[in-house]
Amino acid sequence: MDKNMTLITTPSTQTSAPNTLQEQALMHGGQLSNMAQRYQIEEKDWLDLSTGIAPIAYPVSILPSACWQRLPQHNERLLQAARRYYQTPNVLPTPGSQSIIQMLPQICSTRGFARSKVWLPKVGYQEHRKAWQKAGYQTIDYTDINELDQIKPKDIVLLINPNNPTGALYSKEHVCQLLEEIHSKQGLLIIDEAFMDATGQQSMAQELGRRNRAISNRALSTETSSSSDYGHNTDKSDALIILRSVGKFFGLAGVRLGFVLASESWLSAMSSSLGPWAVSGPAQFVGERALTDYRWQEEQCIVLTRLSSALETVLTQAFAQPVHGTSLFKTVRTPQAPAIFEALCQQGIYVRLCDEKDALRFGIPHEQGLKRLEDTLHTAPLQQLLLPCS
């Protein structure tokens, strides 16, 4: 791998995860009911910035009654919409990416990776770590992609790109180099691209699609199926699994819809594990329309860029520390993170205290919410916490 490989943005490197499952569950964002009860503030009075979900949701029309009455069917229209959106032929709808995160370790153990070591970003979405460790895998932390030149044969590498919560984004060219090295060692690269939609030019989905199409063309030309080769990991596409989320960019977290992009053999194994009727009829209906509404997607990118830039300006003015993130969240590392989190909660503003407890992640608010956040950050209690340490 290129030793001079660099990040588009710089990741954080702090450690220290929550000590108990109860604490870890509490640390997840999106638990507004719990916060309302804890601070005795009604839910309607909170400004919830605890998630990385877009503040503008894709507009959902009235759903046909058949969506509710019939069992979910194989939906070719949804598949075609996903193939066009992600620019790859092999896609599998899932009830959110979390379901695949939880089942991936078991699937990998049946496909020649039972004794593999798993490389995980030291700072990142902790559900990945929970799943692999629960399945008994040995995990190794890394802080920078350059450290991955130490991987051994059959190792599994988990890349969160862009990273949640640091916002670190590796370029597609650099990830392609990493894939080459992992493939040469018969390993597996899993990329969580849940926050990739607004920076889709850096996604590996199109590269995966190119490789999968090449395999299909080769199979047709030789009249020999390539599926028998998958177990031996002879094609680079079989060394790559990509997880995508519909909930974040489209503001549809409650729909519970995601996609896995991978080779046919990986998708077959995951489909079997998911079982029948995995994705609800309403989710299929909404997902198909959201993925094909290209004009709305373009407008969403523009709006998110504007709102996220405005948030970054407010945070930069309030904090002495640099602000990093994506168009769906901004993160600030500060030693006062727990105290600032508590002070904001007392004012009915719910942000994400990161697992290492040395950073705060802010979801993107509307203009009115941003004004409330800005005003709160300028109050005396917050100003005392935000002053740089002398």
Predicted features by range, described:
Residues 2-81:
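N-terminal "arm"/small-domain region of PLP-dependent enzymes with the aminotransferase-like
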Residues 2-4, 171-173, 347, 355-390:
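PLP-dependent enzyme catalytic core of the Aspartate aminotransferase-like
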Residues 48, 93, 321-325, 352-354:
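Short beta-strand
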Residues 75-117, 125-126, 130, 134-135:
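Phosphate-binding glycine-rich loop
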Residues 140-202, 224, 232:
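Active-site phosphate-binding strand-loop segment of PLP-dependent enzymes
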Residues 204-247, 267-269:
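Conserved active-site segment immediately N-terminal to the catalytic lysine
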Residues 238-315, 319-322:
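PLP-dependent aminotransferase class I/II
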Residues 305, 312-347, 364:
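Conserved PLP-binding catalytic core of the aspartate aminotransferase-like
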